[in-house]
């Protein structure tokens, strides 16, 4: 596998040695609603089988979500067992020919978040987050399977003071909280300045060990109602990142908003749609958006939850397909059909 870099024109990606263009085309990884750390110690075979299935579907990138509480035993104590499994994951990705979008600092399941982590003040928390990324980068630095490091999924730089310990959004989706605040009190600072300072500290931690692999952040979308709700303004954070990642789920009731959102992220760096799915629309609307998105985006990552297309087809034939499974089936069929055009 060749290392991936930003293309000379700054609009996309290339494979470093061959200089061939690279278009990320893949999935956010999950299995039956589980986080990978829930089962990868006891059932690695399922994990490995899923990667082979994703490769067969045409994916060249898989986004994996590392949970902070599983990777850190204390503020300055990485968990060696988790790092061993991460190294094993890198070998699996290399053997399978799949690149990894390594997203860190996950606190998705509130019950798994260490009490000491939530009790920290901002400087201590940022330092603990930097230590996490140092440990991860030290393991990953020599692997050609790393596409990028995503510092945190859907961070928010707060617009006002929050209660002590309220780092997460408090809004669960499927039992998980995917949105995290990087500070609890702006204390007179601009939201975008907090975001830039946080990115610099965590990127610096990675660069202590890995000067080559790309760095990004998985950003919440712009909307007509809320604008840039996250406080991570593309114009401010783009200079600090190798490329921009945005999460866009088209809404059938607002057919033009998805592209309007995407245009807000055209800030002089490559743009990857790091999450998308027919969550609030059908596959026809999603395909329309994805095809239009090529005006700006150069990579697309959807969702996978462990059911193969063959398994879903069999369930449909047996008339035992649930509504959520039907949505996944339609998405996987679209993913396979679009792959030749999008991952070229």
Question: Predicted segment positions?
Answer:
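Surface-exposed substrate-engagement region within the catalytic domains
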Residues: 260-271, 285-295
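Active-site mouth of glycoside hydrolases
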Residues: 2-243, 253, 276, 280-289, ...
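Aromatic- and carboxylate-lined catalytic core of secreted/periplasmic carbohydrate-active enzymes
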Residues: 304-344
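Substrate-binding surface in catalytic domains of secreted glycosidases
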Residues: 252-259
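His/Asp/Glu-enriched short active-site or ligand-binding loop at hydrolase and phosphoryl-transfer sites
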Residues: 247, 301-304
